[in-house]
Amino acid sequence: MAESVRRLAAPYLTVEPGAPAPGTWEVIAGATPPAGCVAESVTAQGESTVEYMVDHHHRALFHVAPEGDSWVTQSLLRATRAIHRSAANRQGVLFLHAGLVELNGRGVALLGGSRAGKTSFIMASVLNGSGTMVCNDDVSLTADRDGDGVTGTGWPRSISVRLDTLDLLFGRGRADTIRSSLTHPANQTLLSLRESGVEPHGTALLYPWEYADLMNTRIGSATKVEAIVHLSLADSPSEAGMVPVTGSQRAALLDKRVLRLPNKHLNIFGHEPDPDRSQRTRSALQNLPTFAFRYAFRDVRKEVDHLAGRLAEHFPSD
């Protein structure tokens, strides 16, 4: 099981044999929870409910259900990630709803809400040979010690890809083959979201290692952020384009994408942030070159080159 978690966690977290350090949280499967534990559950849209028992006194979290290796592995990874992200939040690390890509070697944070086109854009950039994904949907950011630069770090989270994105980038036949090969257990139930109308485009979950194999690429674990792009999908090609975001607008747009909690679920480990460090990161981000970029979904591969070209104009010394 540890080997399975290691594969899912790479390249963001490492798994090593040995006893946990005193006072650290443990995530346990295959053992009976002791008396006095508190029930905790995670219910994500389109997924089976994952049940835990939590021993707060001894800092232990026990996986209870569902059974089966794939769900146990996913459950252990999710809980481990939540523990680390809560610790990072306490240290003042800032979490944004954003993707992070190295576009022609330059770290670009792509900010946007759900279905803003972040994952499609990053995948298209990789296929174009110009991009390396660090993360596709949520990034943690930390200001450098001098307060000027910012480093973005990814986390081991499955990559949610629209089914029409797979069709667009790979063709319907290969997209069907890709979907049938995916191992995230929630893929067995996610189609219910499209059938119910909750997710009209449909979605599939790829683990990072599956993404790397599919795209024949490496995944970066962290990179310096050199530009911020507020990304959105245009309703028609005529609406596509890129404009700079002025200083007076930057704070408000950035604040819309700040995650108030470090995790979608399992915020039970303490996460009150260091306000000074978090504010330094916000200030550093507001000083970065910032743009709003709208693109037409069907033209995503062409639009990758468009954004890369406009950024190159802004950084002529490169």
Predicted regions and their residues:
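Intrinsically disordered, low-complexity boundary segments flanking structured domains
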Residues: 11-18, 38-40, 47-49, 88, ...
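Glycine-rich, often acidic-flanked micro-motifs
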Residues: 97-98, 102-113, 127-318
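Conserved glycine(s) of the Walker
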Residues: 116-118
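A generic structural signal for short, solvent-exposed coil/turn residues
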Residues: 17-21, 42-44, 54-56, 93, ...
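N-terminal start-of-chain detector that recognizes signal peptides
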Residues: 32-37, 71-74, 80-83, 197-204, ...
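Long, basic/Gly/Ser/Thr-rich N-terminal segments
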Residues: 1-65, 72, 298-318
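Post-Walker A alpha-helix
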Residues: 121-122
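Extreme N-terminal, non-catalytic leader segments
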Residues: 41-105
